Regions:
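Active-site-adjacent betaalpha module
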Residues: 1-5, 42, 55-179
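A short alpha/beta connector and helix-capping loop motif
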Residues: 4-7, 23-48
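N-terminal nucleotide-binding beta1-loop-alpha1 segment
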Residues: 7-14
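A cross-domain feature marking catalytic cores of carbohydrate-active enzymes
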Residues: 14, 48-51, 127
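Short acidic, Gly/Ser-rich segments with clustered Asp/Glu that frequently serve as metal-coordination loops
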Residues: 16-20
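Short, solvent-exposed loop/turn segments at secondary-structure boundaries
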Residues: 21-25, 135-137
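Short coil/turn segments at secondary-structure boundaries
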Residues: 23, 50-51, 74-77
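A short linear-motif detector with a strong N-terminal bias
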Residues: 25-26, 51-53, 130-131
Length: 179
């Protein structure tokens, strides 16, 4: 079970042209935006990466505008874990579990999640917050991640798991995001 005080969010490459070229891109952007809003409402640490932003563009404005106190970590490698600044941010987050969202599921999300799992972190891929250019590649990534021990979750599922109790102060803000 996810615990609010031991879970962070990783955002991978929800950027420019790439974000608009993936399967069901509007739903992906909307769901990732909701996930970021929820992470902020729950006060989860957020680690945010961008793949070669000079070429692929910045993170979509719907997400970028929510994170004025965060800076994206530029990367050239497909796994964000190969970037020292990303690893520093992961360690600084002070948590053992991470939700991961972004694109593309079968490349950067897959490689980052697999490496984090290999480092001993609990990683859960938020399946309605990841995509690839084809649904087959997304399914392949999720299947392979599951076989590596990375769990699958969904936007609502992870929120309710983190909130745990309808009497919690965080329940109402989360409920407002998903209803």
């Amino acid at each position: 079970m996810l615990e609010k005080n031991n879970t962070g969010l990783i955002i991978i490459d929800v950027q420019g042209k790439l974000a608009h070229s993936v399967h069901e891109n509007e739903a992906l952007i909307a769901n990732c935006t909701t996930l970021v809003k929820g992470a902020l409402a729950l006060d989860l640490p957020i680690v945010w990466a961008e793949q070669i932003p000079q070429k692929l563009g910045a993170t979509v404005p719907q997400i970028n505008s929510l994170l004025p106190d965060h800076q994206p970590i530029d990367k050239f490698t497909f796994s964000a874990c190969d970037e020292p600044r990303f690893l520093d941010a992961i360690k600084s987050a002070g948590v053992d579990s991470f939700l991961i969202c972004g694109i593309e599921a079968h490349i950067c999300v897959y490689q980052t999640a697999a490496m984090l799992k290999g480092m001993g972190f609990n990683v859960e891929v938020v399946t309605d917050c990841v995509s690839s250019r084809t649904p087959e590649n997304k399914a392949l990534a999720i299947n392979k991640l599951n076989r590596l021990g990375v769990q699958s979750t969904g936007l609502e599922m992870c929120f309710y798991e983190l909130v745990k109790d309808s009497r919690s102060n965080s329940f109402k803000p989360i409920l407002n995001l998903i209803k």
